[in-house]
Amino acid sequence: MVSELSLPEFEAGLSASLTCKRNFACFATFAGEIIGALRGSRLRVQLLEDFSTIGKDSVLSGELQVLVLATMQELPPREQNEVARWLRALRKVHPGLVCIATIGAHENGGPGMTNFLRRQFWFATRGPKRACGALRLPKRAAFTVHPAVHRYVLDVLVHIRMHRLLDHSQAGGASSSSAEDVLDLCRWLCSANHPEKTFVTPDDVQQACAWYFPMHLDVIRLPQQEASVLYGTSMKFAEDLLIGLRTFLKKTGTVDNPLLLETLIVQEVLGKVVPAI
């Protein structure tokens, strides 16, 4: 059983992304780990390491199904945004192509990517633990989303945007497309976990939020980003809060989940928001 504080497994992320034709990110030491895991999957895979070639027509070879992107964390923000724009254009030309971003634990926390680049990927998974065999993808079916369940998703978004440890100037990382992204993931979870049902449940929403949001959250990194400073809270207090968080994460260890703090924030929000009945 996967812990609530763990990132989803690589195989689950691959299955979801291939079914829904979405990109996702994977925490791995290097892109070769992902390439090695995909060798037995019977998928047509290519590795892209040189991002200076992304504007050329010949960057993709043949009828690809999966494009593995090497680590982009060392790229300057401007170049990361250029990659993001290229991925958006690529989606229009190759709508069935799935791109997998290789990311590692960043020294400042989070995935180390610009907001624009992060939004090109659905969610983040753990690194592959074993080779992937031929995947049996669940069939996409129409699942009913009751208005109360939709409202539950929106309530979660509002609480995330208001969370004290998230950057309010960036809406906490919950963008305008987050609700539909979460609902897409809910529908896939329905088809994978209980295809006999025809509707999305609050449990599906909670699991989808736990998978989706950790990669997208904008955690405050500087004392002046703490919202209460605007209303008179001492900058020293905000700084002590951040130091305490960093100390906690160092003692806890984030080897199994580099997005542990973000995951804890999501779990706290899910514990506060009353699920749809």
Curated annotation (Swiss-Prot):
Source organism, top-level taxon: Eukaryota
Family, as annotated: Belongs to the MTC2 family.
Described purpose of this protein according to its UniProt entry: May be involved in telomere capping.
UniProt-recorded name of the protein: Maintenance of telomere capping protein 2
Annotated source species: Eremothecium gossypii (strain ATCC 10895 / CBS 109.51 / FGSC 9923 / NRRL Y-1056) (Yeast)
Gene name, Swiss-Prot/TrEMBL: MTC2
